[in-house]
Amino acid sequence: MEVDDGYVEYVPVEERLAQMKRKVVEEPGKGMMEHLSDKKKLMSVGELARGITYTEPLSTWWKPPLHVRKMSTKQMDLIRKQWHITVNGEDIPPPIKNFMDMKFPSPLLRMLKDKGIMHPTPIQVQGLPVVLSGRDMIGIAFTGSGKTLVFVLPMIILALQEEIMMPIAAGEGPIALVICPSRELAKQTYDVVEQFVASLVEDGYPRLRSLLCIGGVDMRSQLDVVKKGVHIVVATPGRLKDILAKKKMSLDACRLLTLDEADRLVDLGFEDDIRHVFDHFKSQRQTLLFSATMPAKIQIFATSALVKPVTVNVGRAGAANLDVIQEVEYVKQEAKIVYLLECLQKTTPPVLIFCENKADVDDIHEYLLLKGVEAVAIHGGKDQEDRDYAISLFKAGKKDVLVATDVASKGLDFPDIQHVINYDMPGEIENYVHRIGRTGRCGKTGIATTFINKNQSEITLLDLKHLLQEAKQRIPPVLAELNGPMEETETIANASGVKGCAYCGGLGHRILQCPKFEHQKSVAISSSRKDHFGSDGYRGEV
């Protein structure tokens, strides 16, 4: 029987989370936070075996212009203050306020201009000099802040430099690798890479080959690109792990690794897959980690992988984008779908509607079509081809409304979104931050409307209340009346410098009340019982 090289075993999200958290119940003597930090360093097996520890960041050819290098610490701090940038780390490269001084080739500068990007955003002002200097970086920025260019432009420069010095041979590469939590985000990032690579070719520079390495696509076509030699790979964890396990691609030459939406990667249970990827590195690489939120579990994850990292924060981790007007409305469950039509009148298209489950997405989509609204819908139950087609129609402006589950909230770039409607308040505040980050991008103001009712837990609503307070938004009466344990300990928390939950980053509760931590413990307990008794024991599978 012929073995299908394109086969990738699918492990459901629930099972991945159960595998990760099973240790919580198997080792009851450990404290809660100890379970988050007891894993080995994020290094390759070879590095661990040889006892290698990298203590210094990689060096690069890039240096900022002389007038930038001559800036005093006071001048640099003033620029950061003006751009609302917070930094942390040793020997931090200076911020640069224009792309010209970053020494990008003229084709890339022209492409930026053609895309209407005249000036760098705050994350780019500080993040690009950090990455170009070869430093490991933790980038904390709300979705829509322009963080994609912070890693795309430097990795194109690195790949171009390597290609000019010693061209990539057949089967070699990649030089740079990006790992994304979803196929949609990977495809979007790949498209950005291709646009800038094409601009270089038009100007006579060597052709850089890039690869989109995701599931749902025939692996053979991806391997054909690898065989020719590849400079840049944008991948999802599952397909990348499978190709590496089959020894179809090597990371021996990889110098730059980016983990985009790192909080989502860990939340979706991909941490072990990423550790598997690290096993394939043979030498030191520059590592970049980007996240919209920064709970303790991500901090631990980052410190095990990065060397003397520079943290660049353009908005406190967990706080929502200040360019979004957040409106929270109490709507009874049975009235939500009718009230939705009224909400759509608040702004002109395009509008995003987020739901917690697939059935609601389908129901709302059908209802809007019956009412004459030009709408499309995506969720995890739809084919990849159908999802891509719906997204393309929405992006092209041929459809006014996109109804989606959180599949669409993982970093997808929909320009000029006027309004985001949360048909359901998500169970985790991190998802709320990701969702409303679809609007209010690139300095433009957007609106986010969220429906709440008695179906939401009080802890979730307290998280929302505190986030609204931090973002200086109006607090609706139904939330203002809520008082939780955080109200009594706010003074102590501020004095200690610790805000909210150490596990998930929520602002309205502590780890002892964390619903996310409790849920994952429950999943682990449930899975361990199933393992002990099997499907033939009590309550066997029917």
UniProtKB/Swiss-Prot annotation:
Helicase ATP-binding domain: residues covered: 128-312
E.C. code: 3.6.4.13
Motif DEAD box in this chain: 260-263
InterPro entries associated with the record: DEAD/DEAH_box_helicase_dom, DEADc_DDX41, Helicase_ATP-bd, Helicase_C-like, P-loop_NTPase, RNA_helicase_DEAD_Q_motif
Domain of life: Eukaryota
Pfam families (UniProt xref): DEAD, Helicase_C
Molecular function terms from GO: ATP binding; ATP hydrolysis activity; RNA binding; RNA helicase activity; zinc ion binding
Motif interval(s): Q motif: 97-125
Record carries keyword RNA-binding: yes
Residues in Helicase C-terminal domain copies: 323-483
Positions annotated to bind ATP: 141-148
UniProt keyword Membrane, yes or no: no
Keywords for the protein's UniProt record, in alphabetical order: ATP-binding, Helicase, Hydrolase, Metal-binding, Nucleotide-binding, RNA-binding, Zinc, Zinc-finger
Gene Ontology annotations of biological process type: mRNA splicing, via spliceosome
ZnF (CCHC-type) residues: 499-516
PROSITE patterns the UniProt entry points to: HELICASE_ATP_BIND_1 (PS51192), HELICASE_CTER (PS51194), Q_MOTIF (PS51195)
UniProt catalytic activity: ATP + H2O = ADP + phosphate + H(+)
Family listed: Belongs to the DEAD box helicase family. DDX41 subfamily.
Domain notes: The Q motif is unique to and characteristic of the DEAD box family of RNA helicases and controls ATP binding and hydrolysis.
Name listed for the protein in its UniProt record: Putative DEAD-box ATP-dependent RNA helicase 43
